[in-house]
Design a protein with these regions (language model features):
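Cleft-lining beta-strand/loop regions that shape enzyme active-site pockets
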Residues: 1, 64-65, 69, 86, ...
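Active-site rim recognition segments
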Residues: 135, 288, 295-320, 324
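Beta-propeller domains
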Residues: 3-11, 44-46, 78, 94, ...
């Protein structure tokens, strides 16, 4: 069926798509192929990390919000919300003009911004170093986490803590460990958000982390100052999950549910709790997945292609999400 396409495959991008189509016939997770070009000299738009005002109709770009950690978010900068960027490195920005090409390949390089404050009429210049698209995504992620944390704080009247685990690896685990036993150590319970987590291998560490039981209470001179274990969460928890959970991010809520550690809320997680080996070919750019290990859950059922339903199903309405409201 796929042989007819072979005469027309003359590059690895198309070959990866064809391999993915063929593997897709197996209807299993952790399959498919991809192409990672090795060259790093292509176009790359640097970022100033702010939200433009969509209602601005004049020349330049008016700033609606400066993202925390942005190159514009500096102690010695006069740039603030409402200021208009009129030119980048001397190139004027006309009304409605696509100004992003002016930042091509300029990540980490000094860039001169021409600025105007419509309120005061003041005009001036500042030099900043734009960041990469990857760093911008990191700042946006942290912005999202802060807003979720603030919402949990508000809705629980300060009684519950919140932590999001972005991946199943050592770094994200250290982040939530620090968050839970730092900011939230005195909270009555923890909301652990796993949404959009692409997986890894952390299910054992997380279930151990959340399954602590108090065996000692420290009481010097009659005053309670803490409990042991000190490195495991012993209070209630709840896990938020959605359709974006994958691989070990399915394994974890499945194990969490099977062990009776708490309840889950959100949307159905696809049955993708399977171990995989990603094989890279000799060119170093073309890779494909080889699923190797399936798992039986606490009910003796295979997790692959066996989805997990939440205890409390809540679907986020995209219209409300656009308003910044997270119903889950």
């Amino acid at each position: 069926e796929y042989a007819k396409f072979l005469p027309f495959i003359d590059n690895n991008i198309d070959l990866a798509d064809l391999i993915s189509e063929i593997q897709g016939e197996l209807n299993a997770s952790h399959l498919g192929s991809g192409y990672r070009p090795r060259g790093r000299d292509g176009d790359a738009t640097a970022q100033l990390a702010f939200f433009p005002d969509p209602d601005h109709t004049g020349d330049g770009v008016r700033i609606a919000e400066i993202i925390e950690g942005s190159p514009l978010d500096a102690a010695d900068s006069e740039i603030e919300v409402g200021v208009v960027i009129t030119a980048i490195d001397g190139a004027a920005i006309g009304a409605g003009e696509n100004w992003y090409p002016l930042l091509n390949r300029k990540a980490g390089e000094p860039v001169r911004l021409s600025l105007t404050d419509p309120g005061s009429g003041k005009s001036w210049h500042e030099t900043v170093k734009p960041i990469s698209g990857g760093k911008l995504r990191g700042l946006l992620y942290q912005r999202w986490v802060r807003s979720r944390r603030d919402e949990v704080e508000r809705l629980s009247d300060g009684r519950l803590g919140y932590a999001h685990i972005r991946g199943m690896s050592d770094g994200p685990y250290r982040e939530i460990y620090e968050e839970v036993f730092g900011r939230h150590t005195e909270k009555e319970g923890i909301v652990l958000d796993t949404r959009f987590n692409g997986g890894g291998n952390l299910v054992e560490a997380l279930t151990t982390f959340l399954s602590g039981e108090v065996y000692f209470t420290a009481v010097p001179r009659g005053r309670v100052i803490g409990t042991e274990p000190g490195g495991r969460w012993t209070k209630p928890s709840i896990v938020v999950m959605n359709e974006g959970n994958y691989s070990d991010a399915h394994c974890f809520p499945s194990a969490y549910t099977g062990l009776g550690l708490g309840e889950t809320v959100g949307m159905q997680v696809p049955g993708t709790c399977t171990s995989v080996w990603w094989e890279t070919l000799h060119d170093g750019a073309l890779y494909f997945g080889i699923p190797e290990v399936g798992y039986l859950d606490t009910n003796g059922e295979i997790t692959e292609n066996n989805h997990l339903d939440p205890d409390h199903e809540i679907d986020n309405d995209p219209k409300l999400e656009a308003e910044g409201r997270d119903q889950q």
